[in-house]
Regions:
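Long, ordered, amphipathic alpha-helical scaffolds
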Residues: 47-142
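Eukaryote-skewed repeat-based solenoidal scaffolds used as protein-protein interaction platforms
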Residues: 1-77, 86
Length: 142
């Protein structure tokens, strides 16, 4: 769908990274969310193939100015996916910690639910539920 509508008018980007991760495509998941967190997305530029033109993901930490910008507007689902995938690909690195810090700032209830080992809801009625359902089992896996 993102290749047909790379501007993502339907909001597919909020969950595709988590689905790629669940499918074992860790590198593609990080490449995807990094494409949507790039400065081009801030400007409203169309992301090539909606971010599904997977490349090699970066392990570099973001500059402070970029971290601040992402903290203001980005969907938490992208950042939680970035945190998990960075950790899986590169270990306990600065980028993984940075993504998690930004995600927790945007939507802290996700971490609370995961740390409390709450069972994911059977019905998704908010962004928090969506992120929790799609990523909680991935975070808990060894």
């Amino acid at each position: 769908m993102l290749r047909l509508c790379p501007g993502d008018n339907l909001g597919q980007r909020s969950w595709l990274g988590s689905l790629l991760l669940r499918a074992g495509r860790v590198s593609d998941a990080l490449s995807f969310v990094q494409a949507w967190m790039a400065p081009a997305a801030d400007r409203g530029d169309v992301i090539r193939h909606g971010g599904t033109d997977f490349g090699k993901p970066s392990s570099e930490a973001l500059p402070a100015s970029r971290e601040e910008k992402l903290s203001d507007y980005t969907e938490a689902s992208l950042l939680y996916t970035a945190a998990i995938t960075s950790f899986k690909l590169f270990g306990d690195c600065t980028a993984a910690r940075q993504y998690l810090r930004i995600a927790a700032k945007l939507n802290p209830i996700i971490l609370v639910k995961i740390l409390a080992r709450l069972k994911p809801p059977s019905m998704i009625d908010s962004e928090s539920h969506e992120i929790f359902v799609l990523t909680s089992s991935l975070i808990r896996r060894p």
